[in-house]
Amino acid sequence: MRTGRWLLYDTNVYVSALRQGSLDPLPRRLRETLPRTYLASVVAAELRAGAITEAAKRKVREVTQWAQRVGRMVTPEAGAWERAGDVLGKIRQVEPHLRSKVPRLWNDTLIALCARDIGATVVTENLQDFELLRRYVRFDLRPFA
């Protein structure tokens, strides 16, 4: 990843880190990029929805509280919601075979638009959905590898 570039991690990167624990290199890699990292409120909501155990809830709270405390929480504004609707409508129109997938793309679309708005790169393990979105909206994307 380029030095000095803002990063916005997709939910799956945090989930992998939380599942693997603090001794694994994945969380260490996340910590190393914290000075360049924003957290999308959409990702925070997905993390909270998926945190079942008290330990998981505590870890998610730590991440979200850090982002809020240092001013690194990014939330889609009204215009982003409208653009997301336009993007998803265009996908339905141009690629009708993906019609059933469109409802599952809302959050990823909002994440991509938030990243674009702040000049960040989306980092994800879910390249397929984000590559689809890149056919309809410009944003920077990198695999988490």
Where does each model-flagged region fall?
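Acidic, PIN/NYN-like endoribonuclease modules and their adjacent C-terminal/linker elements
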Residues: 1-4, 112-145
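Helix-adjacent hinge/juxtasegments
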Residues: 63-75
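Active-site neighborhoods of divalent-metal-dependent phosphate/nucleic-acid chemistry enzymes
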Residues: 72-121
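Alpha-helix capping/helix-boundary segments
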Residues: 13-14, 43, 80, 111, ...
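Short active-site oxyanion
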Residues: 4-5, 34-37, 69-72, 116-121
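Short, well-structured N-terminal submotif of metal-dependent ribonuclease cores
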Residues: 1-43, 49-65
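Phosphate- and divalent-cation-binding pockets in alpha/beta enzyme and binding domains
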Residues: 17, 46, 83, 132
